[in-house]
């Protein structure tokens, strides 16, 4: 989009007592990102009078925050039943070690002591499953490193402790991690999963506290962390 507001061509619609209009943006570019066939709006149960003029306004609000060269979701991913969703706010998370907010490496399961093989797969990526499927992914170690280098300070949002990144644009709640024994360790520290594996069944993650934010690889595949997804 080259402007904040764009007007479409005028289309003729035959009047009916009750009809549904579908608006689909087949080609859409915002900034340097393509969103082709991603936006569809249905206006159902509408009545149109003969000779009338009507205007339908579609407002597009971004569901991501661009920091450090990546677009980050506005909330952590969580599992509920067999489905995956984003929290309604950046500070939100599901409490409890198996409440749906902690994931081992390379697995869709939020249960304790679960992980996938040594090659990270989209089929095992909780972010990849969020509708529309294939839009998001777990960040790489470099993407988390870039987020940490974008400017960090500890703080709180909505009463939840955590860290701000990129000039207060991205907030990650500090939730600690879930050990193999189903214990929530270091709840005042932030640990966020990457898709990048390390040696000996370890993996990279972003760790932050009141003093620093660094990329680390101390923990194992089966140690569960929260995930903040990025756009693919």
Segments predicted by a language model, with ranges:
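C-terminal, surface-exposed recognition/capping segments
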Residues: 76-80, 91-95, 107, 112-113, ...
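Short, compositionally biased
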Residues: 3, 8-133, 196-198, 221-232
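Short helix-loop boundary/capping segments
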Residues: 1-3, 172
